[in-house]
């Protein structure tokens, strides 16, 4: 028998946006965590898939944020506690949400976290240096992963800026009827993921 106090390691905390199940890997299905920073005049958003390491950032108005949410279909959205009411009023979604304290959304804190994570002196090489609200969202994403005890983040080694021309925009009705992201049937074939949609880009000569 062991005498004294037995120290036990802290395990990773699993929430919908940071789940890394084998089923997701087998189906090549993205599981995006989203961080939304509702600010004026421009909001910022980050999408991060801890399984694949994909990390995206964007900035724009609420309508643009809503369109991106429809396209990426995140399984969890991180918000500051003060923005929950506004989120419910402006976004028509039942996605799982988690709230963090206001101080986590400080711009300098988020910026420093990203510099530390990417081991760089600036974010110019990632094309997001001028996206102040998006930088906040990205920094909060890294904070959340660390806060939920996800220590192995070396595979998250790039950050891609999203522009409005990157997507073919469709409304919720079209997406639902075409079953582009989630099947309307609980049983049956696997849904077509955002990854699969991106793999078939239309090129213009």
Annotate the PLM regions:
Residues 1-198, 203-205:
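Charged catalytic and DNA/RNA-contacting regions of genome-maintenance
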